[in-house]
């Protein structure tokens, strides 16, 4: 992204390898997003960040918003069940942060995948294993810890119910 720095300056132009100079349109708006904690992603270069007018870190939305969004996207109707699923997703995210488990992710996409999988399988526990736990970490020991510390206190192995 550092190669774009000259476009973000006041003069807003970049010279292509062909020698052609491209001028930035005066109404240009640049939006940059990244997940720096994801494997393969790097931190954004400070010189690039310095050229931004506004920098905002975005965390997971509140549980209420997560419930609303997940139900809207999936068509799920059981708000109590979805709220329990949101609690598990948030608790997994917290557990991973507190225990330095950084090789996976757990957020809205995992939640939505879990709800949709549960609709198909009618097995909330097994669906959690293949949509939430499996994405949170590849380490088998950490997965077992997530299952016993976070998943099973809310959803026992035998529980089967649609979202």
Predicted regions and their residues:
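C-terminal regulatory/interaction module of P-loop NTP-utilizing enzymes
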Residues: 1-163
């Amino acid at each position: 992204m550092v190669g774009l720095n000259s476009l973000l300056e006041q003069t807003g132009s970049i010279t292509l390898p062909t020698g052609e100079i491209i001028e930035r349109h005066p109404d240009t708006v640049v939006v940059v997003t990244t997940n720096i904690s994801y494997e393969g992603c790097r931190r954004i270069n400070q010189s690039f960040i310095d050229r931004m007018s506004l920098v905002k870190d975005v965390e997971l939305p509140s549980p209420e918003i997560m419930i609303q969004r997940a139900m809207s996207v999936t068509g799920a109707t059981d708000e109590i069940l979805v709220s329990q699923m949101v609690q598990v997703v948030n608790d997994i995210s917290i557990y991973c942060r507190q225990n330095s488990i950084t090789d996976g992710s757990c957020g809205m996409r995992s939640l939505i995948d879990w709800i949709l999988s549960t609709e198909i399988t009618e097995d909330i526990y097994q669906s959690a294993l293949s949509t939430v736990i499996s994405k949170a970490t590849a380490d088998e020991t950490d997965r077992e810890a997530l299952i016993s510390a976070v998943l099973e206190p809310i959803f026992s192995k035998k529980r089967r119910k649609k979202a």
